[in-house]
Amino acid sequence: MSINIKRNQLKRVVIVGGGLGGLRLAEDLCNANLQVVLIDKNNFHQFPPLIYQIASAGIDPSSISFPFRQIFRKRKNFYFRMAEARAVFPDKKILQTSIGKIEYDYLVFAAGTTTNFYGNANIEKWAIPMKTVSEAMGLRNAVLSNLERALTCATEEERQEL
C-alpha cells in the first residue's frame, strides 16, 4: 500500500487525528497556502459532545458522524487517508502509517483520548465506555435489551437482577 499523495511546492502539514482538535486545525490550515494531510483510523468525524444522545436513543448515529471527504470536498490542497500512525522518524521528517510512509514539513498529533479506568480492573471489566458511536450503540442496545427482558420476567426479583 501507499499513501499516494504527490509532493508539490507547498509546505506539507500532516495531522494525525480527526477529532475536534484535528478537524478544526485542518479546516483552519486549508485556508492557508499549505498542503494539508489528515490521517485518521476512521473515514468520518464523530462529534463527541452528542455521543450520549446516541446511547439514550435521542438522535441517530448519522446525526453526529460526518465523512471527512464530504467536509473537505471543495478544498484543493487537502488530502485524507484512513490509516493509523505507527512510528515517527523526526530526523527524516517521516511518519510511518499502516498504509505507508509520508514525508512532512510539520507534524501535528491530535489523536484524542482513551478511556481511563484508573487501574481498576473491575471498572474496566464491567463499565461500558462511551467515546465512540459504536460504544454508545452498545450501551443503548444493552439498556433496550434489558428493558425488553424485564417485560417478560416472572417475578420482581428477576426484574431487579437485570
Region spans (language model):
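FAD-binding core/adjacent interface of flavoenzyme oxidoreductases
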Residues: M1-L10, F78-L162
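Beta1-alpha1 glycine-rich phosphate/pyrophosphate-binding loop at the start
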Residues: S2-Y79, Q160-L162
